[in-house]
Amino acid sequence: ALGGGLEVALGCDYRVALDSARLGLPEVKLGLLPGAGGTQRLPRLVGAQKALEMVVGGNPVKAKEALSLGLVDEMVSGDLLDGALAYTRQLLADNAPLRKLRDLAVSDAQDGLFDQFEQSIARKQRGFKAPFSCIKAVRAAVELPFDKGVERERELFFELLVSPESAAQRHVFFAEREVAKVPGPVSYTHLRAHETSRY
């Protein structure tokens, strides 16, 4: 589950993933930040430090790491639906409580964490707005109530959406995808040089 898929999953009480799954929020690579409350729920689940690494870096984690972080609650092999249904039956049998991430506090948000993280990426990310907006969004998860944090996330998202940096990053991303669709290699072996006269 990448991007929107993980954001939807974070809105659920429990999450089940295949053992081959990769989970992440790569929007920063498009000059954006995760939406739908992703920057607000993720820190409440995995802690501020790991959320910063995932949101600002945009790199996914494998299912095994996601399980150890608490990002997913169950990892299955084989058929995902069968595994998810079996886990759901177990939760019901155990009378497991509903869990709303919005109600959790963010752990491990020690003083100076955000400033230190910003300094650590300053040189490498110079000229890019999205990584710094991602830091602001995760910081909002720590400092603001959930609903206010989601509002701040939305404001930051729309600022990035209309920025020239994001437009350029999205253009490059989609251009690279289109290049891959060119049918077959182009051959110029059938062309021959011809002498031409001037005028």
Q: Which positions does each model-derived feature cover?
A:
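Hydrophobic, secondary-structure "cap" segments at the distal end of domains
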Residues: 39-49
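Glycine-rich beta-to-alpha active-site loop
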Residues: 1-30, 34, 62, 197
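Conserved small/polar residues in nucleotide/adenosyl-binding loops
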Residues: 189-196
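Glycine-centered loop/turn positions within well-structured domains
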Residues: 40, 52, 198
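Conserved structured core elements
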Residues: 33-36, 45, 65, 78, ...
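Amphipathic alpha-helical segments at domain termini/boundaries
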Residues: 7-11, 54-156, 174-175, 180-188
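Long amphipathic alpha-helix in the N-terminal Rossmann-like dinucleotide-binding domain
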Residues: 89, 155-168
